[in-house]
Amino acid sequence: MSFTPGKQSSSRASFGNRSGNGILKWADQSDQSRNVQTRGRRAQPKQTATSQLPSGGNVVPYYSWFSGITQFQKGKEFEFAEGQGVPIAPGVPATEAKGYWYRHNRRSFKTADGNQRQLLPRWYFYYLGTGPHAKDQYGTDIDGVFWVASNQADVNTPADILDRDPSSDEAIPTRFPPGTVLPQGYYIEGSGRSAPNSRSTSRASSRASSAGSRSRANSGNRTPTSGVTPDMADQIASLVLAKLGKDATKPQQVTKQTAKEIRQKILNKPRQKRSPNKQCTVQQCFGKRGPNQNFGGGEMLKLGTSDPQFPILAELAPTAGAFFFGSRLELAKVQNLSGNLDEPQKDVYELRYNGAIRFDSTLSGFETIMKVLNENLNAYQQQDGMMNMSPKPQRQRGQKNGQGENDNISVAAPKSRVQQNKSRELTAEDISLLKKMDEPYTEDTSEI
């Protein structure tokens, strides 16, 4: 006796479109003999073995008894643990729970920029001895096929399951026994379609998402589900990011223009609401360090709250309640130094506060906190002292160390005796010349 999934062995009759029995109608199974309203949409052609896809993708020549499992993350393998992976079907005993999952490579679509993008594949289940690989033995290594069977099933014989006739047999939403682990990066299709349609990708995606949510909700009201379906919100978000070509785990690259926009956005906030980071430093947010702003030095001034040591300091920061109720507050009116003289002057006030944060050595991370505080409190004084120190004389290239204090003395040419201005005793010749210089000048009138 052959078994029909979704029907008890005592009753093999078809009851048409049933509701509330855990079975969904395929979206393209329109009864041509009845007057069915299409709500303004054209009737979709029925998928057959000879159907061709215009944009690539292989054809699903056989109808699966169950809704598919769609991949939404690239690089994830489709696999089940041993003894798992066979969907639950009323009327099918555990001895017949054997078969394989068949990978359907879906069609591609054109993006807004004109590029072709391939949809991720969808997997469908077929009982052993049915479907596109009906003649293959269980466990045969075939690309795009994953074999599954329950522990009670004999995989050496085909399953005694009839092929599904879409005109009379309805598709069953895929559900698994409790404890089944769904492959990571996949979700169960709730629309109940075993073949792709010719509608646009955006309409198909939105309809599949909404229909999937409804089918899972209805399934939960009928019978307890196995808990193997991942969170649909995360799935849809990851699927949308994959459609847009973005990776949720990839960090965003910060360009100069982006950094400028972030810095301007921070500076537009009130002073007490700013949070310095790599794009907007401490000095840009709050000014230079000094007696009234004496915290921060080194890397912390550059990184601000992005510094790896900052989170442990943030544990000491008071809450809003502690700030207002645990501090001494004073309201003072100050001079408005901003704006032009032609503009109306605004009244500016300062809420001045004075308080303390008390902690002891039992605080978690006490030693690290003390180390960070000692490195950053009044660090500006050390930096100013280093800037005021005279620069160390640099050694000339080619000179060796240990030459003494005369290393930096320039060597000039030796001076003459006149330049040296050294005194010496007059000689007899010098005295004779001096006497001649003292005698009066007389003109020589002798004739030659």
Curated annotation (Swiss-Prot):
Residues 52-194 are annotated as: RNA-binding. This is Nucleoprotein. Residues 61-190 form the CoV N NTD domain. Homooligomer. Both monomeric and oligomeric forms interact with RNA. Interacts with protein M. Interacts with NSP3; this interaction serves to tether the genome to the newly translated replicase-transcriptase complex at a very early stage of infection. It comes from Bovine coronavirus (strain Mebus) (BCoV). Residues 1-55, 157-231, 266-297, 385-448 are annotated as: Disordered. It holds the Pfam family CoV_nucleocap. InterPro entries: N_prot_C_CoV, N_prot_N_CoV, NCAP_bCoV, Nucleocap_CoV, Nucleocapsid_C, Nucleocapsid_N. Residues 193-223 have a biased composition (Low complexity). Residues 422-439 have a biased composition (Basic and acidic residues). The modification Phosphoserine is found at S167, S191, S390, S423. The gene is N.
